[in-house]
Amino acid sequence: MAPVKGPLTPIQVENLQFPASITSPATAKSYFLGGAGERGLTIEGKFIKFTGLGVYLEDKTVDSLATKWKGKSSQELLDSLDFYRDIISSPSEKLIRGSKLRPLSGVEYSRKVMENCVAHMKSTGTYGEAEAAAIGKFAEAFRNLDFPPGSSVFYRQSPDGELGLSFSPDDTLPEKEAVVIENKALSEAVLETMIGEHAVSPDLKRCLAERLPAVLNQGLLLSGN
C-alpha cells in the first residue's frame, strides 16, 4: 500500500504516551495505533478522568475495512455505528491498552467493565452459561490486583474468540499473558463497550474516526514512535 501523506503518530492522553506502533512479546505480532482517548465519569457535576484507552490494530485490518469505508469522511465514520462494529468484528487481532490516570483496585476496575459487558451481551442475546463462566474467569483475574497511576491492562481480542489479559506496572507489554479466556461474545463485548453504541470513551471513538480515513484511503505509514 502507498504511504499516507500524514503518517500516524503517537498520541498523548494526559501524561500517558501511546506509541504509533507496538509489538507484543507474547504473540510476536505488531499493531498500529488506531486511536486513543480518555475514559472518565461525571461525579457531582465534574468530569473525572480515570483511564487512557488505546486501540491497536493489525495491518490487515486496513484491507478488511477499506472495502466498505474507503473514501468516507471522518464525520461519516463517526456517525456510523456499523464502522465501529466492523472494527470489532474484523478478521484480525485487536490489542487494547487501558492505562490508569488514578489509582484503582482490580475489583473496582473490573466491576464496571463486567457490568458493561454483561449488559451488552444480554441486550444482544449472547449471554448464556458459557458467558457467565467467562465473566467469572475475568473477575478472578483482577481479584488480587491494584492499579496505581501509570499501570496498564492489555486486552488481546482475537477473531477466533480469545480474550488475552496482560497486566503491567507501566506501559510495557509483558512477556506472557496472565490469562486467556475462550469466549467470543465476551472478547468482542470488551471493545464494543469502549467504541460501540454506548461507548465509555467518546474521545476514543472520535480519535479513530479522525485518524483512520487517511490510512484507509492511502495506506499505512508509521512515524514518531
Swiss-Prot record:
Entry keyword annotation includes Isomerase: yes
Enzyme class comes to: isomerase
Q: Quote the record's binding site residues for substrate.
A: T51, N116, T193
Q: Which residues form a coiled coil?
A: none
Q: Which GO terms describe its biological process?
A: flavonoid biosynthetic process
Which InterPro entries is this protein grouped with?
CFI (IPR044164), Chalcone_isomerase (IPR016087), Chalcone_isomerase_3-sand (IPR016088), Chalcone_isomerase_bundle_sf (IPR016089), Chalcone_isomerase_sf (IPR036298)
Q: Which family does it belong to?
A: Belongs to the chalcone isomerase family.
Q: Remarks, anything else? A: Part of the biosynthetic pathway for all classes of flavonoids, a large class of secondary plant metabolites, many of which are brightly colored.
Protein name (record): Chalcone--flavanone isomerase 3
Gene source species: Lotus japonicus (Lotus corniculatus var. japonicus)
